[in-house]
Structure formats: C-alpha cells, structure tokens
Amino acid sequence: MNTKIKLLGLGLVASLTLVSCSDSFLEEKQNYEKFTPEIYNDFQGAQLRVNSIYGQCLPNPNSAGAWNNNCTGLASDMQSKATEEYTGISNDAATSFVDPRAELSSSTGFKVPDYFQNEQKHLANVWGRIRNINETMEGINGSTLSQADKDKLVGQCLFFRAWCYYQLVKWYGGVPIITEVQEPDPGSFTQRSSAKDCIEFIVKDLDDAADKLAAATTNGGWDSDNWGRVTSGTALALKGRVLVLWASPMFNRSNDQTRWQNAYEQIKNSIPVLNACG
C-alpha cells in the first residue's frame, strides 16, 4: 500500500510539473516580445512564418465568406456590394453607407459596417494580418539568409500585404498605410491616405513581389513541394484586378479613359509572365 501511495504521489507531482511547464510554454508563445529573431536565420523557420500568413489571408473554398475569409465561389462578395450600383439606395441601415443622403455617424446609427471586425480588437483582423506581414518581412530582411531565399519569402509577403490593402480599399476607400511594425501605443495615430495613394502603394507592392518571385517562379512555377504558392504571375494578375477597380465607376466618376487603357495594357503585359509561371 505504501508503495502504491508513493507511486501515486510521484505521478501527481509529475503531472503538476507538466501542466506548469505547459502553461508557461503557452504563455511565453503568446508574448510576441519573446519571439526571437533567430528563427528567421533558418529558411524552414522563416517559411513557417510565411505559411502562417497564407493561413490568415487565403479565402476558405469550403465555407461562406466572413470578416476573416474573403469571398469564394460559395459566397457573395460583400466588398463588391459596397456600391450603389449593386445595393441601390434606401433608408435601410444595412445599405445606408452607400446612400449619399445619409449622414454616417455612430449617433445616427448609420455607419460603415465594421466588416473586418477591427473594433473587436481581434488579432486576426485585417490590421493584425498586416502587422504580422510587416513583422515577418522585417525579420527576413534582417536575417542571415541568402538574398535568393529572402526574395522568395519576402515576395510572398508583399503579395499578401497588397491583397489585404486591396480588400480594405474596396470597402473603405483610402485607409492608413502602415509599412512597419508599430508599438502597441493606444495614443498612436496614422493619418489616413487617399484612395489614389493606396492604389499606388498596392501596385508597387505587387510589382516588387513579381520582381522578387521571378527567379523562383517564371521557369514553370514552383516545384511540387511548393505548389499553390503565389507567383510573379499571381502578383501581376492581382495588379490588373486592382487597376480595373481603380478605373471602375467606384473610383472613376469622370470615366477617365486613361485608367481603363492602363489596366488593359497591364493585363495584356502580364499574360507572358502568367504562361511562364505555368
């Protein structure tokens, strides 16, 4: 009996120790200040961080669209509904943000919907994703990886930062442009940029992404182990889509034909790159 009690006591001590270590481990991983930069000096470690960006930003093809999952074939495109051409004009609060007669404010109850759940301070909201992308790029650029490896990884990050801003601009127009990791200061403030500045920023990110990914993806695309990752062609295809949005009535009320021509030329020029990427 004494032997059984001793064994039971040792088992309890061991289990408590494991629980304590497990809790400590989880708490440490939740503290982003303890994320050591050495992880970026190893290609696999850096790639895991890039993979997490895919997980946060890619649409889910098996579910309806939501604030953290963009539109898929199974869901309506909520951001594209943010136009009077689609929704019409009414006194309904759900569509009042496209009604030029409605005063948008929290006091009237009519305001642009918080589609991306930013007010909920959720880590996976669109600004949390952008912060994660900026942090990952800073870590990779400051690492000891070869320039070729840096380009492969940073190129993917640039694409997803452009993707996040494309979704924001479709919904809100001009938004703050943030390219560096900011300290979590409640008093910090970043000025809102114009829609034009945002479009130019998105286009530059996509051009840079296409350049950085060219060596790895324009000779038939990624190898079989990396199938499905973004390529130079992916970046240029999104660039064409962004320029069509900029030329559309949503942002081009005067119907400036040069915007349409620019979008056409960019899409036309991207076709050889898309073919080269497989």
Please provide the spans of the model-predicted regions.
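Bacterial Sec-dependent N-terminal signal peptides
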Residues: M1-N31
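Membrane-proximal, proline-rich intrinsically disordered regions
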Residues: C21-S76, W260
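Short linear capping/connector segments at secondary-structure termini
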Residues: N31-F35, T179-G187, D223-S224
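Short, surface-exposed recognition loops and adjoining beta-strand edges that mediate ligand/DNA contacts
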Residues: P37, S63-G88, I178, A214-T234, ...
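Conserved, well-structured interaction surfaces
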Residues: D42-N51, G55-P61, G65, S90-Y172, ...
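Extended, well-ordered alpha-helical segments in internal regulatory regions
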Residues: C164-V175, K239-F251
